[in-house]
Swiss-Prot record:
Organism of derivation: Emericella nidulans (strain FGSC A4 / ATCC 38163 / CBS 112.46 / NRRL 194 / M139) (Aspergillus nidulans)
Gene field: pif1
Domain of life: Eukaryota
Composition skew (Basic and acidic residues), residue ranges: 1-10
Compartment(s): Nucleus; Mitochondrion
GO terms assigned for molecular function: 5'-3' DNA helicase activity; ATP binding; ATP hydrolysis activity; single-stranded DNA binding
CDD domains given in the database record: DEXSc_Pif1_like, SF1_C_RecD
Cofactors: Mg(2+)
Stretch list, region Disordered: 1-39, 96-173, 180-199, 208-231
Protein name listed in UniProt: ATP-dependent DNA helicase PIF1
Keywords in alphabetical order: ATP-binding, DNA damage, DNA recombination, DNA repair, DNA-binding, Helicase, Hydrolase, Isomerase, Mitochondrion, Nucleotide-binding, Nucleus
Amino acid sequence: MFKKAVKDHSAAAARPLQSTIPNSSGVASTKLPPPQSIGVKRKIELTSTKSTLGSLHSAVYFDENDFDDDDDLDFESPDPYIPPARIEKDSFREESFHAAKSNSTLSHKADSQSAVTVSKTNYESDIKYPDLPPVPPDDNPGPSSSALPWSSSPPSHFQKPAAPRTVPWRKQENNIITIDDEAKPETPARPAATAPWNKTASAIKEEQKELRRQNKKAQAQKTQSSTKHHMPRAQVAPIFLSQKHVLKAVVEKGQSIFFTGSAGTGKSVLMREIIKKLRDKYRKEPDRIAVTASTGLAACNIEGVTLHSFAGIGLGKEPVPELVKKIKKNQKARNRWLRTKVLVIDEVSMVDGDLFDKLEEIARLIRNNGRPFGGIQLVVTGDFFQLPPVPEGHNREAKFSFAAASWNTSIQHTILLTHVFRQRDPEFADMLNEMRLGKLSPRTIQAFKELSRPLDFHDALEATELFPTRAEVDNANSARMARLSGETMTFNAVDSGTIQDIQFREKLLSNCMAPQTIHLKKGSQVMLIKNMEDTLVNGSIGRVVAFMDEATFDFYVENENDFASGKFDEGDEDRAARARKKIKGMGHRDGGVTVTRKWPLVCFIQPDGTERHLLCQPESWKIELPNGEVQAQRQQVPLILAWALSIHKAQGQTLQRVKVDLGKVFEKGQAYVALSRATSKAGLQVLRFDPRKVMVHPKVIEFYRNLVHASDLIKSKQPPKPQRTISNGDEDVYIDELIAEAEAY
């Protein structure tokens, strides 16, 4: 039995191994299987002379030197899988053949060749794979969404899947998360180290000023919130809508304009805005703009020069040829005429008509230009119903500028401003307009007579009394000063300028609002003559409550209640004294005014009834030429005594409390100027009202009948009027309609 088993085993070993592999039908096949994996070597002996066990041993034996070659251990990355349906049988056989050939060893070359021969001849299998029917190529393929002919899926399965739904709250949540993700965290800046012991005196002073500014702002907001239900809210705009048309015509279109209006229509505000815009326009050539006025007072208010000073004609009484020779000898005056492109004239109502004609002819001769005013653009303003020009001779009647022969050719448009800002009461504004025209109704006369009652206010301020002459003003103020007790403080102005002649310089500055010398006492009623802040403007009335330096004022602001009640601690007084001593040591030692000088502390009453304290320190007033040369300059505290004021100096001012005695009025327009300074009937007292004192020149009434509103500048064009013909031929906007007297006022 043992021999039979060995014999059977030997016969099985002599038979090829491939013959034992069953086929798909369950019958053992004699064909070779697919070759082994790459890198695995196996010895296959088809014929053997050894014993059966030896043949088995040699069939599975691995020599120790078979793996000495490193190439046998390098496994290559497999190729990407290719579907079997697309692989041809012949190619697969060739690849298998090459793989088997590369894995054979060199030591058994003959045996390997015989094995390959057998595998190549016996690889054909009995398995029959089904062949798919051939598909002809389609030249016109249908859309990707169409159903395939060989597929059972509906066409909807081949469409692009719909986007997933998103609920609203999920979308909102995603947005919030996205915003948080995009926000980049920032490391907070390290706060600057504050060392109170390591600050300079100037830094401490700036901090104190900032603290005072914040406290004042908070108090103002508190006052406004407490009074907003009792006081009407005033909305004051720098430039009103109708005034913007004038500003555009002057700055953008370069037209020569004369704009006028009753008292309180914003002529001064509009003129300042025009000057500002023109200087911005010619900022590279500042000497192209000449800012002038008919009087020194008006010139100081707009920081310009008088018209006579600009022209270089002195009094201007000589004939034009002599004046031209005089100007040509003065190189500066000649250059001013040649360089000027825009000439601004304020308060033209006091410019004589003959002088206007002389200036127009001088401009044409000096500039050698035949156009009106030698091609210079004119910006003129004033109210001819107010103070008239002063005639040269006593027997000669005053001649207004609009009566000059060159007025109509030099001025392209004459504009009337009708919106009144100063008087918020329509009834009071109508009363003033009737007085302006010289046509008083019985009702208006009775209303003015009822204003003779005394003014009663619950504070220490009195109404400012207006007088026609300067002597009356000085007498009234001196009498009131004599009634006050206490020390008199004198403040002298510091004058300077390019004019070395002291007398001539003082003559120029004599018309300035700031006096050369002013005497004040505690309790003096004063008026502010400089715009300081929004609520403290030119014309604000106040009372002097103390005299102190800047250091004391800082201490006063912090302890205002203690100052009022007279309660002080010795420590507080010592602290204030040390502060004054420290600042005094830092003062200038060059002979100028030191910071320890005491200045008047004034308590101003604002329109809403609140108080405002201001330490009035020196301000500057300049008389400046177009080229920037300052002919004269005055530094003085911005205050004047305000118990009494001249009508001439009051022109252009806005006063909350006014007292007028019309029995002393002697000139046309004086009554209207005096009464129109008031803002309401509650702050106006009129003594000895006489309708015969209300005098208006008939030529002025005739002139104002043919004026156009400012808004008509942007309306449609009409054929030009003879008196409004534009000499330079430029296309422009013409007057649309004539405004009747009743409609204008």
